[in-house]
Amino acid sequence: MSYENRIALGNLVPTLGQFKVMDKIPQYQQCEVHNLVEAPAEVPEVLRHVVFNIERGQTLHETIDFLNMCPDFKNIDIIYANELDDGAVRSGNCNVAYEIAKSIGMNYAYGLEFIELVNPDDNKGFHGNALFSRWPIRWAKVVHMPEQYNWYNDRQKRIGGRCAILAKLDVHGREVGVASIHLENRTDGPGAVVTATLPIRREEKAQC
């Protein structure tokens, strides 16, 4: 998507609102899933999880080195990752989720959260959430949260809003459900509760 197209879509936000503009952009309805590695031969007694804010990938090489070298990450099965760029100048215009997954030997799912509108040199200006797994990802979807803050009116002008990635992993033949959620930091306590619980409640309702 060209910068001109991103700006044209952004200009619709004040009139239509974020969600109606997001409906016009196919990437918001998609969840990328890339299974890059085989499942581990041994099944651990306990799955080890960690939440990690990648901070856009502005220090991507250092982040990858840390993930590969830190002893505490050696046996991590699942990483719930926030704030990963795809095609933004500030992080080298690369696909941060793919670069991390390839470098640390994990599968990943990625969902679009924001399209950045500030820098015309961004190849895509995409910014989103990811879930990294040592186990195959059999299914994943993106759930967009109720709006708690309109980022189009911020100095970091954007299309989009906070989202969660729901996924099903194949852990040696056993299905394990996981969720990577990025909460809105520009809201109050009740707003945070809404964004934290909605994805699970919505999925439970869909399963009924």
Residue ranges of model-derived segments:
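N-terminal, active-site-proximal structural segment of metallo-dependent hydrolase catalytic domains
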Residues: 1-106, 110-126, 192-195
